């Protein structure tokens, strides 16, 4: 295939890991272990690393390799933070689950609500379908509401990312990475970040 073949490898959670895969020929590396919404790797194996810190650590590589933030992306704000931390791109799983284009059949419950199955590749069910058996399973399967066309979700994510970049006054991922400033946030600060409207009792 020559230079037309792009090799993506992973997953790793350390600078040494990304350097090794780059030295072995990877063009891009998926970074993060056990951060996905239906992933149980950290619990099952005792291995893993906080997702954002993984991206920061891996971004210190001096190899010519793209960093893919993989797992734990829950909203457009998480995408902005992953890109700012050093990722060149992100992989999405749960954010796109339940869409028309996602794998699986649509089924309807007794109340007429539509759902699709969402499962990780390391789940018991996926391994049995793939290999006819399973070894150590590191994920679960779940059902998620049917969400229609994926383009609607992608459009919402795009708008959120553009807005996030505007808050930092940047026009590109490279600009964001050169100008970003991270701070530590308490759990109270995180709670404040979420919507918390109080209803008035008359």
What are these regions (language model features)?
Residues 12-38, 43-48:
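Acidic, glycine-rich loop-and-beta core segments that form the ion-binding/anion-interacting portion
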Residues 1-5, 17, 24-27, 46-69, ...:
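Alpha/beta catalytic cores of nucleotide-metabolism and tRNA/nucleoside-modifying enzymes
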Residues 11-12, 73:
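Conserved residues at beta->alpha junctions
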